[in-house]
Amino acid sequence: MDVVAPAMAAWPETLGKIIWYENDGATDPSWTVADEFAVHNPTTVQVADMDGDGDLDIVSGARGEDEGPNPITWYENDGAADPSWVAADIALTGNNSGLNDIVAKDMDHDGDIDIVAALYNSDTIAWYENDGNADPTWAAANISTSVDAAHTIVARDMDGDGVMDVSSLGAGNKRINWHENGGTRSSTAHWSIS
């Protein structure tokens, strides 16, 4: 198994990195840096097939430049044995929104991978719906705007109804929230907070 990880810079004005460590496949494996991407203050990374072409792409969340927008970016894998990557923004979450965490899951059960993000400074859990095209576009919607200092998110089917729900941690009030997806496997997702 390979590893993809964010590496924040020591100073805000310097770039951080998203680094892909490739496993050599040995019984006692070692990893080498296979690729890296310069990113301002990366906070989180996910690996998923974002465009449905059968290979794994990389998605990163970052705090961006000082007081600037916080990008969610996906790096499209070209599918080669030694892949090349093309970066495209999924969303710019707003100046100084405090993008803290992302999850890449099929939230609306339509067969493509969507993004959920925790935005610390705006107390928001946001959902970016993938339209499912080979060159996807993303529709933004808020799951909640009342998670005090939104910090960490997990997407799972919490109530066994066949659709993805979201759990979030509000670091400000140290509260764990459950955002129930009230949609069905054949209807649009909609959310309530418990």
Explain the meaning of each model-derived region.
Residues M1, A5, G54-L56, G111-I113, ...:
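Glycine-aliphatic tripeptides that mark coil-to-beta-strand junctions in extracellular
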Residues M8-E13, R63-G68, N121-D123, A171-K174:
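Short glycine/acidic-enriched loop and turn motifs that connect beta-strands
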Residues L15, P42, P69, L99, ...:
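Short coil/loop residues immediately preceding or within conserved phosphate-binding loops
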Residues G16-Y21, N70-Y75, T124-Y128, K174-H179:
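A short loop-to-beta-strand structural motif that recurs across blades of beta-propeller domains
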Residues Y21-H40, E76-S97, E129-D148, E180-S194:
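Blade-edge motifs of beta-propeller repeat domains
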Residues T43-M50, N100-M107, N142, H151-M158:
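Beta-propeller blade termini
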